[in-house]
Amino acid sequence: ARRAAALVEVAWEPVMPLLDLAEAIEAESFHTEPQWIRRGDVEHELAAATASLDAVVVEGTFRTGAQDHFPLETHVSLALPESDGRILVHSSTQHPSETQAVVAHVLGISLNQVVVQCARMGGGFGGKESQANAWAAIAALGAAKTGRATFVRLDRDRHMTMTGKRHPFLARYRAAMGRDGQLRAFDVALYSDGGWSLDLSDAVTGRAMMHVDNAYFWPAMRVRGQVVRTDKVSQTAFRGFGGPQGVAVAEEVIDRLARAAGLDPHVVRARNLYAAAGEAGTTHYGEEIGDDRLRTIWTDLERSSSFLSRRDDVAAWNASSDAVRRRRRRGIAMTPVKFGISFTTTFLNQAGALVNVLVDGSVQVHHGGTEMGQGLQIKLSQVAADAMGVPLTSIRMMATRTDVVPNTSATAASSGTDLNGGAIMAACATLRARMAPVAATLLSGDGVEVTADEVHFEAGSVSATSRPGVRVSFADVARTAHRERVSLSSTGFYRTPHIWFDRETGKGRPFAYYACGAAVTEVEVDGFTGEMHVRRVDILHDAGASINPLVDIGQVEGGFVQGMGWVTMEEVVWDAAGRTLTHAPSTYKIPAATDVPSDW
């Protein structure tokens, strides 16, 4: 295959590429029309602040860079031709149903002739949400044309050269704050670099617009978002999906306003955190925060991390003769985060599942999510075990297949456990309801007639309130139900309730809830070489009733390190023709074990 690929000759006509965001904006090279989210009279507030001695106004431009997903496993697909023109595709994809649709479109066949299966991926981070589709389609086309199994795998160079990255953003902003530290108005235009064609850029930009407030209440806001067309690879989803870019802009603006007013940025942040309710507890798109977690987390972390005393220690160290002589400086900062959980495209917030109870008491669970190392399968195993009342060892998670659970949404938007877990719980509830009357019959005796509503499934055994000393095994109930022709297979469906968003008005309730947290980061920088080391990190994150604390801690730590890499060392470089120069580990550097904070 590689020898054949080398024989292909491509003819093209060179053009002057548009690569810089600012230049592309100036050239009016856009993929989309502007989106808007508005609250209050921004122009009035900015004008009033400009004319007042009691306020400060800042304006400027802020950029965020690209980032490569760098999964351990590159894009890979195996297509197998089956009878009657059907195709089975094993794909490293976060979105099997979309991959199924693209393969069917390329082959010119209906969806029911294509099955996509994903057992697991070697990393995704959003890079396999939509961009896995092309390689699956190429493999499927090869299988359809030759009648033979076709395998497509990108080597690292091709993967990094040909696939999209985290969207670079350019923000142009004006903001006003009273000299008392109270935020007044924020006018910001967010431009995302979508590359040469439109992938998920419109939705990425939309989420950035919803997160450019981060954790802070602005009485007046005007947010413009637009996708810019450049002659680069088509940029795609990446962990956070525009949220980190919006948050970065928010924190830059807070820092600039605080310094312009001569105030402590830490105090400004604390003063403007969202409240639980009322106007100060409502986002610029109209969703109420609903609780006071941000302020609680802030106060708790400030205390547990000894932030204020450590900040004094940092200032003293920087003033020491040793630090001055060595040209080294330390810094410490505390920042919050508020991240909305749900797809902002409302209809995607749905999931299905199929749960089968076998006659030996073991359970098979099918769902539409995909495992990419984030711990989805173990969490959903725990959900199923708890819902069915069986040991974790009785649960078997099956590979994700579009012919078993169809019409799925991508495993993205931090929604995989919520959506698929809800569907699994619904299926398990149906099965318990079917099995309870059977169990009640088995548990009845000694003149006591057990009813179905008093049956309890727990840890692989079944009991009843009215006969506390009597138990039967879950396997016995399953075998008896099968003999009595009770269905031991059930689908489940879940859709996130009470969410909506109107793009025309820029208002709605797009998120089921917010994940909130805060971090204190202490760093040391060599003022001569620029070398940086993270000395200590304290993170406090509200995980709710955590299903698996170890998995959640791993996600928090991994997310921090990946974000640290994005803002400190990972730099995607394109040449003057738009070719990716950082196409291998030799030229693109991600955090190593030595870069992990010394003290977590």
For every predicted segment, state its role.
Residues 1-296, 300-303, 310-600:
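Cofactor-binding beta-sheet edge motifs in enzyme active sites
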